[in-house]
């Protein structure tokens, strides 16, 4: 392993096998199957929500569950890529809902949660919402950013141990 010090910091060289092992751990991708719902953790970018809309239209799940509230007291706004869906949203879930609707998902298929401020809360507050609505899931698809997949999967699996979760 070729290690160097750059600007006072030790740098590590990883070989291809090590890089692949890290990649395989961080990035999850299951073979998708039909499910009861699609979990959509909050984000100011539209891409993973556009993918969730495509999965809905392809018949993978009848219910979409976007989750996301405020960060530091307010929704910080959408990314440059997300501005095509509008710019004035009270919370992340409102933005995600707009992305879904503008991509052909009917409002009746969306059940949003507008309080979560981080990934674990996305899962916890979505569970509370489902319990209030007396909705019981057996299988769900977790639709999130690729680099966020392992962390999201771990949190959602912890909060929903009774549900099979596909990423």
Write out the residue ranges for each language-model feature.
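A structural signal for short, hydrophobic/glycine-enriched beta-strand patches
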Residues: 2-167
